[in-house]
């Protein structure tokens, strides 16, 4: 080998050694960086995959994911193993950083770490305090009020036993330190971490409801000086657009605790200025960046660049300190100034931008995403990881990092970002911004000049330029011109209502009046609130079910225009592969890292010294990395490492060949939404979608101007049958109808009374042997047996030796009480004896008598605003207020009443008969017209010819089940029938009710003590399986042809006997037993414990009138209450003063003498038209020619009823007429008598949202809401009130002026009777007229014919309770009486009987004008008076009543959508409107829950004919079969011959009765007598008026049953499933005893429980007795109760006397002889020992309290206690079992 070769080899070997050394250094630094990353901060929300940026996983139920955090609702259940969040090295030396806001005032756990059923770490948020739990009984409490609706940034610094609470970013934050009582134990890695939810099972703990923006755990307690920089930027900016506190939270307190010094008073605003940071480019290229923080100094950017590993060369602690110092790289953000108001972005339809040339300006821009475009990657630090997402991976120092060229996909989410619009003129493609799963901090470039003008929205209203200092959202850049927002609000041209705007604190440092409204966004629109800050992503679009804090729900907006699809970006470069981590919670997926080279085996160390002798060595310096060793033996598989940081995104490889189809993989996670594709072709009509959630009611628009009358519409479809009214009075007896076909079986009737004893039947055949029944439940312990008879006396034994003195005997049984001895003399008082042992707790005594009323307590603190109370009684009419200012000109009034009849026109000439027109084409089938009125009895027609037999009709549908008929008379006893064939074995009867509890049995012998089994070996941890590849989705195959009908199967074998059926109906009441002998008098018992609250007592006598209270604040609107029952009839008013006597009037026509009635008060006379004179009979004219068919005339005015004309002669038979058109609907008639109130109708679907009204003028700034405003102006006239009491007689009216004699009109043609119109409102009181002149003598009128007797009217409804009278004047003071002797307090007397009515009092002053009385009966018709002179114009009257409907006008053109109106005040509850037309069929509802098992169904329809089988062998002769059922109804027969006309029918149904039934006017289609029976006529064709009451009764029962299921009452007949259901349905219930039925079966097995609503609706079961572990709940009900609950707890106390129960010393583990508690499923439970004093064997009663809290409710209640101590003569114990409460 020559020299050159030798040198080359030596040089090569040196180079290889250097490279190896460099590689070792790189590997060491990389591994060191990885270890540092693994032990860095823990972002809990990111580890739980709850960040909105992590779109790869759906969030759990009850969690609403936002870009700035999450919102936890009551249904949130987020759990994960502890080891997946916190590494094992994390001990009690860390900092917990939180940014939360509470939505509900309660005591809740934000998070908890559980080990089994013990809590190891948890934060409890209570009103006014925060409690950090570090184990059972180990907690630190801080006075801090978090329930004020604001965002709070907190930091808990835990250092051993010391816990310090900091409120970062405040000037006065010095921290409050508390000491834990005990050093907390290490976290169990096998424990469970829970976020939100009622997981801690502590008393009074409910799920946390609120928002969490940040939840980080930093493993260092020395980081409190940099906590403010650790708060996320978007969390700190949450304060700048915080919404108003919800209605569920109180206003912020004026007296905040000292720790809240940094918070602001309610009337101040909170502005935030982010800290400025220096962003220095690296290598001058801007490809990567290094971020540092300066304290208050803003250095200029420099071009110097540290090496890539500069952050790692400072030592071990450098990355940790950097993680705390350089958390929040941010852009320079300007402070909000007073001159630049905030931005209000409301939902809008994005306008299409128009690009125009021009310059870019840093105006406020809006894009559809917030996401940053990564332009740099940081080196070996966690810069921005808290603000954006996952941690960055340390870079290798061998290569400088270049700017990634990959362009992210467009983000379909429609959010908004604000910032400048930097452009790059070198690139032709515009990138669309989108947040990556792991975005990194970037440095935005300055906007460069370009040739494109910023895009502007079309709407230019309310344009106000924003500050030019606004920049992009931090960590984001943009390369596409974005639309510039130049307005403070987006307006919309779509006719939808925007969401209601809530008041928020104003954000203006100079107290300018610029409100910053808060909008409630809904998908898919975007809505943003901000105050000139660059990023606002607090609320993202989402759908929320209606909750108490529905702050984020608004009305749905319009669909936006289709966005342009983005261009695909170039492929990215290959990323750095990350290390393979353990299978943790789903996070950002990184690629597995390459395995590193195995190191050399180290040298053998020196032998160690024995323990205790070796001195503790100092910590050595970090050694240099050794040389690379040889490859060692393959080691064992190591434990799972911590999850590694995600690797850089790799460059997609080339398209590989298509592989074979793999096995079907698990369903993948939900992928990120792809880019918006081009607009596709119009698809086919889809199915009706699932109904969406009802939106909040929009603001009431202003009343529009009345439109022009529309054209007459077409006849609508027949409406659905209306709601059934109440049962009306019995009608007249109808004629017997045709006997119809037997109806279907009716509704199962109620259990009838026991009938008379029937005849003894023929004894049946002996039955087969029954199937052996199931094993019955073990019976209760029997009573102690009676003492046996004494045995025969044995022989007398020999006398034994004197024995040794025995031990003291056991105390003998207590003897019977002897006879009462004579009272002895009082002896000397003895010395006080020693205190005796503690007695047993006595049984619960009977409720004691109510104690005397205690002294009046001090006024309590003002409580939270309660729910809206029920509507109070109508107050007295207030005094007449001062005249208000003249109002604006009113709108055009409604159409007035029809005018008087015009003069009769001149009779026209007789027309010429027209020619018969050609036969028209057949018209369309018309709608079924409304039933016409009953016509007059027609004349008898000729007998028609026999018609051809019609074809057989189709089979009719099964009719409705008939109502059960009344029981007929008992029939004669039938002859004994032949013995029938043996019937099938009946179903086993239902299980009977549980019998009463038997007496206590004899105590059993103590069993032998069981041995504790050995602990089993721990199982091995399995290896995680490889995830299968996701196969390509196959194409959808063509739809197959329907298969051929298979042959019918053979008859199955006889099934085995079923399980016992449900419990049967209660048996009949047995005969009353003879009274037992009187027992001996018992001893007087001890005074019992205070009883449970008794039932509500009867209403006491009315108290004295109290002093007038102050005017209360206006209450919140309450829920709509149910209609109350009609009140009793008011007392009759006193007779009013006599009016002034008028002049004698003209003698009227003699009327028909009526019955002498009582003198009634004058009622309001209704409006009635004049009655015309009877005209002279004209001569009979010649019969005219037949005229052409005329058009349907207009509806005539209602004329007076004419006299009954003479019976005409029989006319010729007319030809069969065609079906006439439906008549026009009659006018609205007078209001009828009020009908009986109907049943409560079902709630109809919510109507569509109306078009927006015109925009109202912007209101002025309102006054402070706390200051009581002035008395409002008198409101508008309300709707017509209920019928009031009869008013007092009014003042006599003024005499009218003399009128001019009018001509008497001719009688008008009788018009069609119109429907009764609505009752008009009472007009204003007229002015008093002057005395009129005496009228002329009228002509003598003709005597009218006697009218037919009217139908007896229905009884009117019960009147409402009259108003309360005014308070009388105080009487004169009487003389002072003498002091009487003090009497002994008597017992409370019974309620006295109602006294006799007192004497009428002195007449009071003239009261206010009463409500209008009921409409009086029509008086005798008077003559028409003379028209008076027109009086002076009166004042502007109130708004008139609703006029008659005018003719329908032409359809107007569609108006422009109005502007958004201001929300009006809530209106008064209106009268029930007329029933609306039936709505369209709604979409198919969501599938409901599985219902209970139904009754045995009827036989199904016959199946298809099967294949003809082979001929079978002839069977044996069978028994005689039972009588077959009634066959199917045959085809409808041909119509029979026309019969003679029937007799006149009974009178029609009164109008009130028709309204009561709600069926409209029921008109009989035709009448027939009992002689006219048409064969084949079905039952359904008959009028069902006689069946309507029964149908109504059935519907009422079903309606009440459904209502009780939806709204349980908690009674025995209407039980709830759980107490939680009662708590959710009714907010006003109190703790007490209620009935529940967890399986929702028959209410007979419902159980009585205690409901604790104050702690969230707990269901508590009490044992039968407190001394035994027995509960009167069946296993089935208990299983359902377990399934419906989320946890349970129970408390058991063991009272002990000289016996050890748990441990032998305080605070010691349980001894081997400790008692064991067995759960409901047999497992041994470990209790929480609250107190144990049984180790004290001092001859006194002690006790041990055990508490069981479990997450699995199936473990409780405790059913058995084993290993109880043996009872000795000097030791005793007994149990006190508490109730078990289910959550």
Swiss-Prot record:
Q: Which UniProt keywords apply?
A: Calcium, Collagen, Developmental protein, Disulfide bond, Extracellular matrix, Glycoprotein, Metal-binding, Repeat, Secreted, Signal
Task: Please note every region of biased composition (Pro residues).
Answer: 436-447, 967-976, 1537-1546
* Statement: the UniProt record of this protein carries the keyword Lipid metabolism: no
Location(s), subcellular: Secreted, Extracellular space, Extracellular matrix
Q: Which residue ranges have biased composition labelled Basic and acidic residues? A: 1131-1158, 1170-1182, 1257-1267
Please report the stretch or stretches of sequence annotated as the Fibrillar collagen NC1 domain: 1589-1783
Region called Disordered, residue ranges: 288-312, 327-524, 553-744, 772-1461, 1512-1546
Q: Which residues are glycosylated?
A: 1698
Disulphide bridges, residue numbers: 1619-1651, 1660-1781, 1696-1734
Listed Pfam families: COLFI, Collagen
Q: Which Gene3D superfamilies match?
A: 2.60.120.1000, 2.60.120.200
Q: Which residues form the propeptide?
A: 1551-1783
GO CC terms in record: collagen trimer; collagen-containing extracellular matrix; extracellular space
Annotated Laminin G-like domain ranges read 73-235
Q: Where is the composition biased (Gly residues)?
A: 926-935
Which residues lie in Polar residues bias regions? 462-494
The region annotated as signal peptide is 1-35
Task: Enumerate the spans annotated as Collagen-like domain.
Answer: 554-608, 818-873, 845-902, 986-1043, 1269-1326, 1446-1503, 1497-1549
Please quote what the entry notes about the protein's domains.
The C-terminal propeptide, also known as COLFI domain, have crucial roles in tissue growth and repair by controlling both the intracellular assembly of procollagen molecules and the extracellular assembly of collagen fibrils. It binds a calcium ion which is essential for its function.
PANTHER family recorded: COLLAGEN ALPHA-1(XXIII) CHAIN-LIKE ISOFORM X2 (PTHR37456:SF6), SI:CH211-266K2.1 (PTHR37456)
Q: What does this protein do?
A: May play a role during the calcification of cartilage and the transition of cartilage to bone. Together with col27a1b, plays a role in development of the notochord and axial skeleton.
Q: What is this protein called?
A: Collagen alpha-1(XXVII) chain A
The species this protein was found in: Danio rerio
């Amino acid at each position: 080998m020559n020299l050159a070769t030798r040198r080359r080899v030596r040089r090569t070997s040196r180079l290889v050694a250097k490279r190896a050394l460099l590689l070792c250094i790189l590997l060491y630094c990389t591994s060191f960086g990885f270890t540092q990353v693994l032990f860095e901060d823990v972002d809990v929300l990111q580890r739980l995959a709850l960040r909105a940026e992590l779109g790869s996983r759906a969030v759990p139920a009850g969690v609403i994911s936002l870009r700035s955090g999450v919102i936890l609702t009551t249904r949130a259940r987020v759990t994960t193993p502890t080891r997946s969040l916190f590494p094992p090295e994390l001990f009690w030396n860390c900092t917990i950083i939180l940014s939360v806001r509470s939505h509900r005032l309660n005591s809740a756990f934000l998070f908890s770490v559980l080990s089994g059923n013990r809590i190891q770490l948890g934060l409890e948020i209570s009103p006014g305090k925060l409690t950090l739990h570090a184990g059972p009984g180990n907690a630190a409490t801080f006075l801090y009020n978090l329930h004020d609706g604001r965002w709070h940034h907190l930091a808990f610094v835990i250092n051993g036993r010391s816990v310090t609470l900091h409120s970062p970013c405040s000037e006065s934050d010095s921290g409050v330190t508390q000491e834990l009582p005990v050093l907390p134990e290490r976290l169990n890695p096998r424990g469970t971490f829970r976020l939100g939810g009622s997981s801690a099972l502590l008393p009074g703990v409910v799920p946390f409801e609120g928002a969490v923006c940040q939840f980080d755990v930093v493993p260092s307690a020395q980081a409190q000086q940099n906590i403010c920089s650790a708060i996320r930027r978007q969390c700190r900016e949450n304060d700048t657009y915080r919404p108003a506190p919800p209605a569920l939270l109180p206003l912020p307190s004026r007296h905040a605790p000292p720790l809240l010094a940094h918070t602001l008073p309610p009337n101040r605003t909170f502005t935030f200025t982010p800290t400025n940071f220096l962003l220095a480019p690296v290598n001058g290229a801007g490809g990567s960046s290094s971020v540092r923080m300066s304290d208050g100094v803003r250095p200029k950017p420099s071009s110097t660049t540290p090496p890539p590993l500069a952050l790692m060369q400072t030592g071990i602690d450098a990355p940790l300190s950097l993680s705390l110092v350089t958390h929040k790289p941010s852009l320079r953000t300007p402070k909000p100034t007073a001159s630049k108001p905030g931005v209000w972005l409301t939902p809008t339809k994005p306008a299409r931008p128009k690009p125009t040339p021009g310059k870019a300006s840093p105006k406020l821009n809006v894009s559809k995403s917030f996401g940053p475009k990564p332009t740099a990657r940081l080196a070996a630090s966690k810069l921005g990881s808290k603000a954006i997402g996952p941690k960055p991976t340390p870079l290798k120092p061998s290569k400088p990092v270049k700017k990634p060229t990959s362009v992210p996909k467009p983000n379909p989410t429609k959010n908004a970002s604000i910032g400048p619009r930097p452009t790059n003129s070198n690139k032709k493609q515009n990138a669309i911004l989108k947040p990556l799963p792991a975005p990194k901090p970037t440095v935005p470039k300055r906007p460069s000049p370009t040739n494109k003008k910023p895009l502007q929205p079309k709407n230019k209203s309310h344009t106000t330029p924003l500050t030019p200092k606004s920049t992009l959202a931090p960590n984001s850049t943009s390369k596409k011109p974005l639309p510039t927002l130049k307005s403070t609000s987006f307006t919309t041209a779509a006719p939808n209502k925007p969401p209601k705007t809530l008041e928020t604190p104003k954000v203006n440092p100079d107290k300018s009046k610029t409100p910053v409204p808060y909008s409630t966004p809904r998908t898919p629109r975007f809505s943003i609130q901000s105050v000139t800050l660059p990023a606002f992503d607090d609320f993202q679009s989402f759908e929320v079910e209606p909750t108490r804090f529905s702050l984020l729900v608004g009305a749905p907006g319009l669909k936006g225009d289709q966005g342009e699809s983005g261009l695909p970006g170039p492929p990215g470069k290959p990323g750095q592969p990350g290390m393979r981590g353990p299978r943790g919670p789903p996070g950002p997926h990184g690629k597995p890292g390459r395995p590193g080279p195995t190191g050399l085996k180290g040298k053998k160390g020196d032998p160690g010294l024995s323990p205790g002798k070796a001195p503790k060595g100092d910590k050595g310096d970090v050694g240099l990395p050794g040389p690379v060793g040889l490859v060692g033996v393959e080691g064992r598989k190591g434990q799972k490492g911590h999850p590694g940081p995600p690797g850089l995104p790799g460059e997609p490889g080339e398209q590989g060949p298509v592989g074979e189809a793999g096995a079907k993989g698990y369903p993948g996670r939900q992928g990120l939404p792809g880019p918006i594709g081009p607009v596709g072709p119009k698809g086919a009509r889809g199915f009706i979608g699932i109904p969406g959630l009802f939106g909040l009611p929009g603001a009431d628009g202003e009343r529009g101007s009345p439109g022009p009358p529309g054209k007459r519409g077409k006849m609508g479809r027949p409406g659905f049958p209306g709601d059934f009214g109440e049962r009306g009075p019995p009608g007249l007896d109808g004629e017997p109808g045709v006997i119809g076909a037997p109806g279907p079986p009716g509704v199962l009737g109620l259990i009838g009374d026991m009938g008379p004893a029937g005849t003894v039947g023929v004894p049946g055949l002996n039955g087969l042997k029954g199937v052996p029944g199931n094993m019955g439940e073990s019976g209760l312990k029997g009573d102690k047996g009676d003492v046996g008879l004494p045995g025969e006396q044995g022989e007398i034994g020999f006398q034994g030796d004197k024995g040794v003195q025995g031990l003291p005997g056991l105390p003998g049984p207590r003897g019977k009480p002897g006879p009462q001895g004579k009272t002895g003399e009082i002896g000397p008082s003895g010395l006080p004896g020693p205190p005796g042992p503690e007695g047993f707790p006595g049984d619960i005594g009977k409720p004691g008598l109510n104690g005397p009323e205690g002294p009046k307590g001090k006024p309590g603190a003002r409580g939270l605003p309660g729910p809206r109370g029920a509507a109070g009684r109508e107050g007295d009419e207030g005094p007449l207020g001062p005249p208000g200012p003249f109002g604006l000109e009113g709108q055009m009034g409604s159409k007035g009443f029809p005018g008087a009849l015009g003069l009769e026109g001149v009779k026209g000439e007789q027309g010429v008969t027209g020619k018969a027109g050609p036969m028209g084409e057949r018209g369309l089938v018309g709608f079924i017209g409304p039933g016409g009125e009953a016509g007059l009895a027609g004349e008898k027609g000729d007998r028609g010819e026999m018609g051809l037999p019609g074809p057989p009709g189709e089979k009719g549908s099964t009719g409705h089940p008939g109502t059960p008929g009344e029981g007929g008379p008992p029939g004669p006893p039938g002859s004994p029938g032949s013995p029938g064939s043996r019937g099938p074995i009946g179903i086993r009867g239902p299980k009977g009710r549980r019998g009463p509890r038997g007496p206590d049995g004899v105590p059993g012998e103590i069993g032998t003590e069981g041995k504790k089994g050995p602990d089993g070996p721990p199982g091995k941890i399995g290896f995680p399986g490889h995830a299968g590849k996701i196969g390509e989705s196959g194409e959808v195959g063509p739809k197959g042809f329907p298969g051929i009908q298979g042959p019918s199967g053979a008859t199955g074998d006889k099934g085995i006997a079923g399980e016992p059926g449900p419990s049967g109906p209660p048996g009949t009441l047995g005969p009353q037993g003879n009274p037992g002998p009187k027992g001996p008098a018992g001893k007087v018992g001890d005074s019992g414990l205070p009883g449970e609250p008794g039932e509500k007592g009867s209403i006491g006598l009315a108290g004295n009138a109290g002093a007038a209270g102050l005017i209360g604040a206006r209450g919140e609107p309450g829920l709509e209450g149910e209609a109350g029952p009609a009140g009793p009839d008011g007392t009759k008013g006193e007779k009013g003063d006599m009016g002034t006597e008028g002049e004698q009037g003209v003698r009227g026509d003699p009327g028909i003498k009526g019955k002498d009635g009582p003198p009634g008060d004058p009622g309001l006379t209704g409006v009635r038209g004049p009655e015309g004179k009877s005209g002279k009979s004209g001569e009979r004219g010649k019969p005219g020619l037949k005229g052409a068919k005329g058009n349907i005339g207009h509806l005539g005015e209602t004329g007076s009823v004419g006299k009954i004309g003479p019976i005409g002669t029989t006319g010729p038979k007319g030809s069969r007429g065609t079906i006439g058109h439906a008549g026009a609907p009659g006018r609205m008639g007078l209001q009828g008598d009020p009908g009986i109130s109907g049943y409560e109708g079902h709630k109809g679907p919510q109507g569509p949202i109306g078009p927006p009204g015109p925009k109202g003028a912007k209101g002025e700034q309102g006054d402070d809401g706390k200051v009581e405003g002035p008395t409002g102006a008198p409101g508008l006239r309300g709707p017509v009130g209920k019928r009031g009491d009869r008013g007092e007689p009014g003042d006599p009216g003024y005499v009218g002026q003399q009128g001019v004699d009018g001509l008497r009109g001719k009688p008008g043609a009788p018009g069609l009777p119109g429907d009764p119109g609505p009752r008009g409102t009472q007009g204003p009181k007229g002015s008093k007229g002057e005395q009129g002149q005496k009228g002329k003598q009228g002509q003598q009128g003709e005597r009218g014919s006697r009218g037919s007797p009217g139908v007896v009217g229905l009884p009117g409804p019960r009147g409402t309770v009259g108003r309360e009278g005014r308070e009388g004047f105080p009487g004169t003071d009487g003389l002072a009486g003498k002091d009487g002797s003090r009497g002994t307090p008597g017992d409370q007397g019974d309620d006295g009987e109602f006294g006799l009515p007192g004497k009428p009092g002195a007449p009071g002053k003239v009261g206010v004008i009463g409500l209008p009385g009921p409409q009086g009966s029509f008086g005798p018709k008077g003559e028409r008076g003379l028209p008076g002179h027109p009086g002076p114009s009166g004042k502007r009257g109130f708004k008139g009543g609703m006029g008659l409907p005018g003719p329908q006008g032409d359809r107007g053109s569609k108006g422009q959508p109005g502007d958004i109106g201001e929300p009006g005040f809530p209106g008064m509850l209106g009268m029930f409107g007329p029933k609306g037309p039936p709505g369209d069929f709604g979409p198919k509802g969501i599938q409901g829950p599985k219902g209970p098992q139904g009754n045995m169904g009827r036989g199904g329809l016959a199946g298809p004919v099967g294949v003809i089988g082979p001929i079978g062998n002839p069977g044996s002769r069978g028994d005689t079969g039972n009588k077959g059922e009634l066959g199917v109804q045959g085809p409808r027969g041909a119509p029979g011959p026309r019969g003679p006309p029937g007799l006149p029918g009974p009178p029609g149904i009164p109008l009130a009765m028709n309204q009561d039934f709600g069926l409209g006017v029921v008109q009989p289609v035709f009448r027939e007598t009992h002689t006219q029976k048409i064969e084949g006529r079905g039952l359904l064709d008959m009028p069902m008026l006689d069946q309507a009451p029964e149908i109504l009764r059935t519907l009422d029962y079903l309606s009440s049953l459904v209502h009780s299921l939806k709204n349980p009452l908690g009674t025995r007949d209407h039980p709830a499933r759980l107490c939680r259901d009662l708590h959710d349905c009714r907010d006003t219930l109190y703790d007490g005893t209620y009935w529940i039925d967890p399986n929702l079966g028959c209410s007979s097995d419902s159980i009585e429980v205690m409901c604790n609503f104050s702690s969230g609706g707990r269901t508590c079961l009490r044992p039968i007795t407190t001394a035994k572990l027995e509960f009167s709940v069946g296993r089935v009900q208990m299983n359902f109760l377990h399934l419906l609950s989320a946890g349970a707890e129970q408390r058991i106390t063991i009272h002990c006397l000289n016996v050890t129960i748990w441990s032998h010393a305080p605070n010691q583990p349980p001894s081997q002889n400790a008692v064991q508690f067995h759960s409901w499923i047999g497992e041994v439970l470990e209790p929480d020992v609250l107190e144990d004093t049984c180790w004290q064997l001092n001859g006194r009663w002690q006790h041990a309290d055990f508490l069981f809290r479990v997450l699995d409710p199936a473990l409780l209640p405790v059913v058995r206690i084993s290993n109880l101590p043996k009872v000795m003569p000097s030791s005793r114990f007994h149990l006190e079992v508490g109730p078990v409460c289910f959550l």
